[in-house]
């Protein structure tokens, strides 16, 4: 099973992320700071990182940058309560796979996780939402994300 790191300083949000993904059989480790996650990644490997944007010390964006500069190639999904157009542009330039505003919908996050991992979507409701959304998409990734969020 794929291994996911969750980097979130708010315990309730960390729990919601882990709980929302646990039914899909992922191995999940949580960290309260990006520094802790980075130290862990120096010794181990994950398949995906889900990180808050604003963290004490190193930010989720800084962690994504370090991952891109290093030997790490796993996708990064950012969750934030502080997103704006400039932040989203910077996240995209860094190579972040997706970004979610808090509060987020768990079904859409799961869809993004499966897509980022290149895995088939096993749960029927999410699979139907992905099929409906994909059939509507003919434009940019931004339009696709909007359609996926509306479809689910």
What residue ranges belong to the model's regions?
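Conserved acidic carboxylate
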Residues: 8
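Two-component/phosphorelay signaling modules centered on CheY-like receiver
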Residues: 11-29
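Acidic, metal-coordinating helix/loop segments flanking the phosphotransfer/catalytic sites
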Residues: 30-48, 69
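Acidic catalytic/metal-coordinating carboxylates
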Residues: 33, 59-62
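The feature encodes the CheY-like receiver
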Residues: 56
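Alpha4 helix (beta4-alpha4-beta5 surface) of REC/receiver domains from two-component response regulators
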Residues: 62, 83-98
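C-terminal output helix
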Residues: 86, 104-113
